[in-house]
Amino acid sequence: MGAILMSLIPKLRGLRAAGVLAAAALATACATPAQKSATADTEYLLTVSRPGLLHVIDMKTDRIARSCELPGKFGSGALVPAPDGRHAFVLGNLWEDVYGFELDTCKLVFSARQSEGDVTVKTVQSLAVSADGSELYTVQNPVRRGADRFEVLQPRLAVYRIADGLDAKPVRSFPVKRRITKIAATAGGEVILGGADVEAIDVRSGAVRTVSALASWDRGPGWLTPDAFAMHSQGEHLNEYVMPYVTAKFADDKQDMASAEWWWGMSRVDLATGKAETREIFPFQFVIFSLVADPRDRNILYGAFNTLSKHDIAKRETLKVVELDHTYYSLQLSRDATRVYVGGAGSTISIHDSGTLEKIGMIQLPGDMSTADVRVAWRRP
C-alpha cells in the first residue's frame, strides 16, 4: 500500500478473525448436496478462500453452489472471470501459477506455471482476459536465485493462449515497469497497467502509452503528488477500470499537510475505448480499499475497508457511512445493483442493501479470503 495509507492504517481498528471450523460447517451446509452443475445460474459471485478453494456463489440465493479445489498452495486469490461468464482464472500457489476453471463443473481447463529453473516468478494481482476470451495476461516479476544472491530481473507482460490448456507457455512477452498490480484488457487490444501511473500496453507490439499521469503528473506546487493504490478489480459490470488515489491541495506555498485539503481521486478508464478521466471525487475522511460504481448512476460509488460508504462524485459528497464488523478489502454489486457484497480479508462476505447500506445477509466461507478478489461472472443469454 502507498505511504499515505500505510501511515493511517495503524489508527484504524484491526481485523477480527472468524472461526474456521464453524465456517467450514456452515459452508458445507450451504452447498448443494452433490455440488451439481447449475446450468440455470446466470450470475455468480466468485472469490477464493483458504486452504485453497475457488467458491462459486449463486447470487439468486447467496449460497455456495460449488467450491473448486486449487492445485498447489494458497496464493493471492486474485481472479478474473472470462467474458463468457462460464470460466474463471485464479492466481495461486504462492502468487506464481494461474489456473482456469469451468465454473459449472470445477473442471481445470487451463494452467500456467510461471516459475522455471532458477527463476522464480511472482505476479502481484495482475491477471486479465482479453475481450474476446482468447488470451490471458499476467505481469511477471522474475528473480533469479543464485547460491549467494538474488538477481532482480526485468518485469514483463506475459501473453498466453487460453486454448493451449494445461501447462500453457507464454506466446509473447514485453518489458513493463515495476510496481504494476491490477490490470484489465480493453476492447482495442491493449492491457491497462495500474502502477505509479496508469498506462496501456499494446499486446501485439508492446507499445506503451500513458493513460493517466499520477506519480508523474504536473499540477504545480499547490498539489501533492497522488498516492495511488490498485489491489482489487471491480469494474466488469460497467466495463471499466478504476484506480483510486489520495492527494492534497495545499493552502499556500508552505505546503503544510495539516492545513491542506485532502481528497480521494480516481483514474477511470473506459475499457471499450481505452480513454480515461482523472479527477478528485470526494474529501478524504477515512481509508477505502476498493471502489465500485452503481450501474444505474455512474456518479454513485461504494467504498469499503473498515466502513462501507456511499458517495455522489457529481456533488463530491459522501452520502452515507456504516461501520463494518471487521476489515474488508473488496466489494461488488449484484447485477440489478440492489445488493452490495463486501468481502476479502476474513472468512465472511457481508451483504448490504445498496440504498440504505443496512446489512441484510452474510455468506460464511470455510477459511479467510486474505487478499482474494470478489468478482461477478454473468453468463450472457
Which stretches of residues belong to each language-model region?
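Bacterial N-terminal signal peptides
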Residues: 18-28
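Predominantly soluble domains enriched in secretory-pathway, periplasmic, or organellar proteins
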Residues: 30-381
